[in-house]
């Protein structure tokens, strides 16, 4: 997600600092920042300190074979009677997620503060951050993220949080996006879409990214298999997609999509990326995939809910082909957390008048920037935003965990202030 700039037709692919629309990038930027994961190599070799492994041999494309490692339960949802109080766990929070004692303390504190929902990252940079047979069978990665004590961080988080009455909703952060250096992008160049000029990458604040073609069955199958794997292996309450479950409107000019459009419409793709019929056709294709994905997930677990964290509706549709107003109307999502990262209270509260936030069909919440690394959002601004949301009956989710209090110069003092704002139990 992005923040700090006013509403602008910014580069729609980015959830980074520069677009003013989305969330702090946690993929390539996290790698540059030196995040080190404990990696176990399936063949029994020693672990090594690098999040992205060297290229393995070419993959077969098998279906997933999820064998539940955790006893299945039927998790119960807390909402909608209780407004959302959520927080994302990103790759920048791996130091907490991988350390058992730190994670226990974090979850206890979040419980005391009244948090209802945790969103841990499971899909970032073309790699899975859960125990994934799907990516390993496809030779997209040959490592599994483990905690410092050898534990599965996601399973540990779920166990701790649900004991505190909190929901855990794994977050598929990258959606259809991937770095060009990822095994996914290198092994399947035919899965990538492109602009009218033939470019397959776009620049973001974190560097170059490619976009998987959301209209290709193979791409849809990969995301479906990953999501089904997570809800089968883990006792999660839901899954979350966000502004990267989309496609920048300048993309879709690859040969596969051109042929599909001509076959279905009898016309060539318009040169104008913002042509209304061309926008609608691509957006409807993404909607159709979400419809099928929801059906598959609900068949696996009827109690599961689908969360979405998009940009505001006009931006999402016109620039990202993400027609989430239709998704709400058609019951394809059960929770919406709109990204509104604004640098001051005045511009933030002005955004709360958007019509899509007034809907009563399902719980509506707003994502608030807690800060970046060692630059936490000033507590008076955080307090003003939380109060503005609560006055309107809207839930709140913080991006992300570390700058709430842990990664600050005075964690204890910051935690006390946060407790005063949220009403520590």
For the regions a language model picked out, list residue spans one by one:
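Glycoside hydrolase catalytic-domain groove-lining segments
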Residues: 264-376
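Substrate-binding cleft of secreted/luminal carbohydrate-active enzymes
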Residues: 334-348, 365-425
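Aromatic-lined substrate-binding rim segments of carbohydrate-active enzymes
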Residues: 126-172, 281-293
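Active-site-adjacent "subsite" loops/lids of carbohydrate-active enzymes
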Residues: 78-85, 92-97, 175-229, 233
């Amino acid at each position: 997600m992005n923040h700090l700039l006013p509403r602008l037709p910014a580069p729609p692919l980015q959830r980074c600092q520069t677009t003013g629309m989305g969330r702090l990038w946690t993929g390539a930027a996290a790698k540059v920042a030196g995040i080190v994961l404990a990696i176990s190599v399936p063949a029994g070799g020693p672990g090594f300190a690098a999040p992205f492994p060297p290229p393995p041999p070419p993959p077969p494309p098998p279906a997933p074979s999820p064998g539940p490692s955790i006893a299945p339960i039927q998790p119960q949802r807390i909402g909608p009677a209780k407004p959302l109080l959520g927080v994302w766990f990103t790759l920048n929070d791996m130091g907490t997620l991988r350390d058992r004692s730190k994670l226990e303390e974090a979850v206890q504190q979040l419980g005391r503060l009244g948090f209802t929902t945790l969103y841990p990252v499971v899909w970032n940079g073309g790699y899975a951050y859960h125990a994934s047979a799907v990516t390993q069978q496809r030779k997209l990665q040959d490592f599994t993220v483990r905690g410092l004590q050898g534990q599965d961080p996601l399973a540990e988080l779920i166990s701790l949080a649900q004991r505190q009455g909190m929901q855990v909703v794994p977050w598929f952060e990258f959606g259809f996006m991937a770095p060009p250096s990822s095994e996914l992008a290198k092994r399947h160049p035919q899965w990538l879409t492109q602009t009218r000029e033939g470019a397959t990458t776009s620049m973001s604040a974190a560097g170059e990214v490619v976009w998987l073609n959301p209209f290709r069955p193979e791409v849809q199958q990969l995301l479906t298999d990953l999501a089904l794997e997570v809800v089968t292996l883990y006792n999660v309450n839901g899954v979350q997609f966000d502004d990267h479950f989309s496609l920048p409107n300048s993309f879709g000019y690859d040969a596969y999509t051109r042929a599909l459009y001509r076959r279905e419409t009898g016309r060539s793709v318009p040169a104008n990326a913002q042509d209304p019929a061309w926008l609608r056709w691509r957006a409807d294709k993404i909607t159709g995939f979400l419809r099928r994905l929801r059906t598959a997930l609900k068949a696996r677990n009827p109690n599961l809910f689908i969360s979405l964290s998009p940009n505001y509706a006009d931006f999402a549709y016109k620039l990202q082909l993400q027609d989430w107003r239709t998704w709400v109307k058609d019951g394809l999502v059960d929770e919406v957390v709109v990204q509104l990262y604004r640098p001051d209270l005045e511009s933030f509260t002005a955004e709360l008048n958007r019509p899509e936030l007034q809907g009563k069909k399902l719980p509506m919440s707003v994502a608030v920037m807690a800060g970046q690394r060692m630059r936490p959002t000033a507590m008076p601004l955080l307090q003003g935003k939380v109060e503005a949301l609560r006055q309107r009956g809207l839930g709140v989710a913080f991006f992300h965990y570390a700058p709430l209090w842990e990664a600050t110069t005075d964690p204890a003092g910051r935690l006390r202030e946060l407790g005063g704002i949220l009403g520590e139990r």
